[in-house]
């Protein structure tokens, strides 16, 4: 009878909390109607009192337990407490339901402990809730002590402790408990496999996987994740292919993210498409991995398709998914689309702000990046260490030395953010490229932790710009001491020697590189034309339209020289005649890609080229001339930033 009143909207507006305050003893029939209503939160209907009967206290327990559980699920612990304290009769389920909610909040540990002690007849589930609370929120000595004093333990009790130790990396203790456990289940085996994987011990993880009596999807996925983290992609592929159980979304995500993180974004995106064809809907994690792959490849069209998937799904307001889209648009050169998306986001967390600030920094728009940082502070968003990497990067790309130093000092003073290695790398780059090499070296020596390889690599790059051979030799030696397989260190030093025509030293560096079995990462550039990606390497001999590309480049070279272009021969890193050096420079991969864009794209339209290494000085100079000759905007993204070439100048102001 009562439930029919739920169709009347005025009655739905009556709030549940007001109801609890005004009626100390809710009626069972009314509560059951509330529980079955289609309302998003429990709300009573108003009815004539003569329709109601007075139930016993015991009859109220079940429906009120349901309300407590609903409050806990929605995070309304105070509401659950009000219902709890208003109940004249309770059972163990009542106590357990409230304990679940309170125990999840680290700040209410004492309250949870007190509540547990008050349970008249705690059962195994009560003990397991409290054990999980200790494992999550306090030191393991107390958790172990509580576990040892438990009057009865089930598989969940043992698994909680094993999983807790495994997540802390204490695998010996986890192993000891595992072998003390009388009846192990699938969760027990999964905890051991995952624990060894987190510790990087794939051998032991593989052993437990092989001897496990039941291997479910969790175990298979854990092994795939472990192999991907260890860069053993072929083993992960074999595991994925040989799975004897159905793959779930987490399994697909592990493979897709693994491909992208192991520099195989093409395979990751191919698998993402296969997942969609299987009818599996991606979650925010899978979409983020796919969008990262799009960013790596500058696959803008696929990125836009993923944007459509997000817009038509329940993830349309998901902060993680939208932030990944912003990052993708920024890295694909579509800063305008990124900004539009950022503006319409209903909720922005620090990660979203970081993505947009980083986008402006990568494109060399320091004013916008720093303005956005100030707006972020005004919006009471607390910056983190990644925020300051983006801010310092913006200063770096614009050569704002004093402003960068001010922000570096402000990090600790005003925001209590301790400088990380990445912050020091940004500052060394900022000082070094401004010619303040000694100050950069002084900063490295003042670092509160051991300098890392990247900071010496950055100093080495600055030495090349300013042709400081002595400091370059020091930086290179330090770099190679920290990472003897760092190809960039050898190449940078050889390039500095080459710029000084010290060919014997170049030969010595190359010999050392060969003896150390270090292979230089080959430079290449790519451009997307009508949804097809075209790759180019220096002195490319493979592309089917190479003849027309060479013809176009020779035409451009003549026009550039008439306009005042002189090749920067120091970037031709071979001991050959000047004429041969000019030819080598003309066939650099970024020039080949730009020329191909000039041929294939409509006159006056924008050209976007991407390179896997830093753009060379001669190419940077030449593309400025080409942008003026062709009357086009040419955008080149290298490993450090975006260069926007237009009307004979670059957005970086030649500061890169």
Curated annotation (Swiss-Prot):
Keyword ATP-binding applies: no
PPR repeat residue numbers: 60-94, 95-122, 123-153, 154-188, 189-215, 216-246, 248-282, 283-317, 318-348, 349-383, 384-414, 420-454
Presequence boundaries: 1-71
Cross-referenced PROSITE patterns: PPR
Superkingdom of origin: Eukaryota
Record region (Type E(+) motif): 531-561
Gene Ontology biological process: RNA modification
Region Type E motif, residue ranges: 455-530
InterPro entries in UniProt: DYW_dom, E_motif, Pentatricopeptide_rpt, PPR_At4g14850-like_plant, TPR-like_helical_dom_sf
GO molecular function, one term: zinc ion binding
Region spans: Type DYW motif: 562-656
Major site of localization recorded for this protein: mitochondrion
Location in the cell: Mitochondrion
Annotated keywords: Mitochondrion, Repeat, Transit peptide
Cellular component, GO annotation: mitochondrion
One Pfam family recorded for the sequence: DYW_deaminase
Homology family: Belongs to the PPR family. PCMP-H subfamily.
PANTHER family, alphabetized: PENTATRICOPEPTIDE REPEAT-CONTAINING PROTEIN (PTHR47926:SF347)
Name of the featured protein: Pentatricopeptide repeat-containing protein At4g16835, mitochondrial
């Amino acid at each position: 009878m009562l439930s029919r009143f739920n169709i009347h909207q005025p009655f739905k507006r009556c709030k549940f909390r007001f109801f609890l305050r005004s009626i100390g003893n809710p009626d069972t029939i009314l509560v059951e109607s509330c529980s079955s209503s289609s309302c998003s939160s429990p709300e009573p209907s108003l009815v004539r009192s003569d329709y109601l009967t007075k139930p016993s206290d015991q009859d109220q327990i079940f429906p009120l337990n349901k309300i407590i559980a609903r409050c806990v699920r929605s995070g309304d612990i105070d509401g659950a407490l009000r219902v709890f304290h208003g109940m004249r009769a309770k059972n163990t389920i009542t106590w357990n339901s409230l304990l679940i909610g309170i125990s999840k909040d680290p700040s209410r540990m004492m309250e949870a402990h007190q509540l547990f002690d008050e349970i008249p007849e705690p059962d195994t589930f009560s003990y397991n809730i409290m054990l999980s609370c200790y494992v999550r929120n306090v030191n393991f000595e107390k958790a172990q002590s509580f576990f040892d004093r438990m009057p009865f333990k089930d598989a969940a009790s043992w698994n909680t402790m094993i999983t807790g130790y495994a997540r802390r990396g204490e695998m010996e203790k986890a192993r000891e408990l595992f072998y003390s456990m009388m009846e192990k289940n699938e969760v027990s085996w999964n905890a051991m496999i995952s624990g060894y994987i987190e510790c990087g011990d794939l051998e032991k993880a593989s052993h437990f996987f092989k001897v496990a009596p039941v291997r479910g999807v969790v175990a298979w996925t854990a092994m795939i994740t472990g192999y991907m983290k260890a860069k053993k992609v072929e083993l992960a592929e074999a595991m994925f292919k040989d799975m004897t159980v159905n793959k779930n979304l987490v399994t697909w995500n592990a493979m897709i993210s693994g491909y992208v993180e192991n520099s195989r974004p093409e395979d990751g995106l191919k698998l993402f498409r296969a997942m969609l064809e299987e009818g599996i809907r991606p979650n925010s994690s899978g979409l983020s991995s796919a969008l990262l792959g799009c960013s790596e490849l500058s696959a803008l069209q696929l990125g836009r398709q993923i944007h459509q998937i997000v817009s038509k799904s329940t993830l349309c307001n998901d902060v993680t998914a939208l932030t990944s889209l912003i990052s993708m648009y920024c890295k694909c050169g579509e800063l305008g689309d990124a900004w539009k998306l950022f503006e319409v986001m209903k909720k922005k967390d620090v990660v979203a702000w970081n993505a947009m600030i980083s986008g402006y920094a990568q494109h060399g728009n320091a004013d916008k990046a720093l303005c956005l940082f100030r707006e972020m502070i005004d919006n009471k968003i607390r910056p983190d260490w990644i925020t300051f990497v983006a801010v310092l990067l913006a200063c770096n790309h614009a050569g704002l030395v004093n402003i960068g130093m001010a922000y570096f000092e402000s990090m600790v003073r005003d925001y209590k953010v301790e400088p990380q290695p990445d912050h020091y790398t940004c500052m060394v780059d900022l000082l070094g490229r401004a010619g303040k090499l000694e100050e950069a070296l002084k900063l490295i020596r003042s670092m509160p932790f051991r300098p890392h390889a990247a900071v010496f690599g950055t100093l080495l790059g600055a030495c090349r710009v300013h042709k400081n051979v002595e400091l370059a030799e020091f930086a290179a030696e330090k770099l190679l001491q920290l990472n003897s397989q760092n190809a960039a260190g050898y190449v940078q030093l050889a390039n500095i020697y080459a710029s000084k025509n010290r060919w014997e030293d170049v030969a010595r560096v190359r010999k050392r590189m060969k003896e150390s079995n270090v292979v230089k990462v080959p430079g290449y550039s790519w451009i997307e034309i009508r949804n097809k990606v075209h790759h180019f390497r220096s002195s490319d001999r493979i592309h089917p339209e190479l003849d027309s590309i060479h013809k176009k480049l020779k035409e451009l070279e003549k026009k550039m020289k008439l306009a005042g272009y002189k090749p920067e021969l120091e970037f031709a890193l071979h001991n050959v005649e000047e004429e041969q050096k000019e030819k080598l420079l003309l066939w650099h991969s970024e020039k080949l890609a730009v020329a191909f864009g000039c041929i294939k794209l409509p006159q006056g339209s924008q050209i976007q080229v991407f390179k896997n290494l830093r753009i060379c000085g001669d190419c940077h100079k030449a593309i400025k001339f080409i942008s003026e000759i062709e009357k086009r905007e040419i955008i080149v993204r290298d490993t450090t930033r975006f260069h926007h070439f237009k009307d004979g100048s670059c957005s970086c102001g030649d500061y890169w």
